[in-house]
Amino acid sequence: MARVKYGKVKVTRARRKRWIKLAKGYFGTKKSSYKKAHEQVIRSMAYAFIGRKERKRDFRSLWIVRINAAVRPEGLSYSTFMHGLKLANININRKMLSELAINNNEEFKKIVKQAKKALNK
């Protein structure tokens, strides 16, 4: 049988230790058993990748809900308001519109007024 050098053992141990370190905070054998930790970390990374994509969708829908809630008292729906903005040549993204609606309501009302004016032309 061939002799196994200690260097290979060190490399293997370091690799396994890396996976165990990534599994810190997991429950049960998923944090201590190499095989279970490795499987769970791979799965967790996949969920994290998906989550980063979903976060963008979630925030966009949140901004739309906020804009819609701010525009309804002015007598417009979200879609007609956005159409009015296009007609008025106002290029403000949804994130900024929702921030204006929450933090700077007077300025937002001015924008709504301009959108209404563009719709009536």
Swiss-Prot record:
Domain of life of the source: Bacteria
Entry keyword set: Ribonucleoprotein, Ribosomal protein, RNA-binding, rRNA-binding
Gene Ontology CC terms, in alphabetical order: ribonucleoprotein complex; ribosome
Matches recorded under InterPro entries: Ribosomal_bL20 (IPR005813), RIBOSOMAL_L20_CS (IPR049946), Ribosomal_protein_bL20_C (IPR035566)
Disulfide bonding pattern of the chain: none
Pfam families: Ribosomal_L20
A GO MF label: rRNA binding
Gene3D superfamilies with a match to the protein in the record: 6.10.160.10, Ribosomal protein L20
The UniProt record lists the keyword Acetylation: no
A Gene Ontology BP annotation from the UniProt entry: translation
Keyword Aminoacyl-tRNA synthetase found: no
Family: Belongs to the bacterial ribosomal protein bL20 family.
Functional note: Binds directly to 23S ribosomal RNA and is necessary for the in vitro assembly process of the 50S ribosomal subunit. It is not involved in the protein synthesizing functions of that subunit.
Name of the protein in question: Large ribosomal subunit protein bL20
Organism: Mycoplasma mycoides subsp. mycoides SC (strain CCUG 32753 / NCTC 10114 / PG1)
Gene name, Swiss-Prot/TrEMBL: rplT
